[in-house]
C-alpha cells in the first residue's frame, strides 16, 4: 500500500503493531495521531474521521454507482458451526438462515454471539435480521463456554495493567454490580471502550 500511494502527498500509510484493541476508534486515533478522546467527544472534535474498509467501499458504491447499503459480508464461525464461512447477504436476512446455510449447529451449542468473542453480545433469538452493523455470528459449544466461565475477582490487578483506557476494571465492576452509579461515573466508568480485555486476564 505504501508503494501505491508514494506519489500522493495527501496520503500517508502508518504501520501499527498488531495489538488488540488497537482497531477501536479511540485507540486507533491515539495510535495514529497521539490525540486523545474521551467518551463525550467525537473523532471530528480532534480533526479525525475513522472509517473501516467496508464503510469506504459502501461510500464508493453509493457515490459512483448509486447503490445503497443493502448487503453485508458476515462471517459464520466457531467450534459449534458445521461449515464456517463468509457470506455476502442482503440486510434483513435472519441469523437463523445464515446458521442453516453454514450447515447448522455442530455439537452442543451453548452460546451464539453476534460479533466477535471480545466485543460481541449473546443472542437469545436467532430470528433477528442482519443489519448494517452486523459482522459475524460466533457459535460456541458447552466446552468452550465452560472454559471461560466467570470466576471471583482476587484483586490481582492484571485487569488494570491490561486496560487500554487506563481504568480500574475490578473497582468499576463492583460499582456496576452494586448499582453505585455515582461512584461508577466518578471513577471514569464511562471511559470504558468495552473491549473485554479485563474479562480475559
Each predicted region: which residue ranges?
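Hydrophobic alpha-helical positions that pack around
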Residues: 1-95, 101-108, 116
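Generic beta-strand/beta-sheet core signal
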Residues: 14-16, 77-79, 90, 113-115, ...
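Short, solvent-exposed coil/turn elements at secondary-structure transition points
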Residues: 17-21, 118, 142-143, 178
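Active-site gating/interface segments in enzymes
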Residues: 28-33, 103-157
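Short alpha-helical segments in extracytoplasmic peptidoglycan/chitin-binding modules
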Residues: 92, 97-99, 112, 163, ...
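Extended, hydrophobic interaction surfaces within ordered domains
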Residues: 101, 105, 113-114, 189, ...
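Ferredoxin-type iron-sulfur electron-transfer modules in oxidoreductases and energy-metabolism complexes
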Residues: 134-150, 160, 164-201
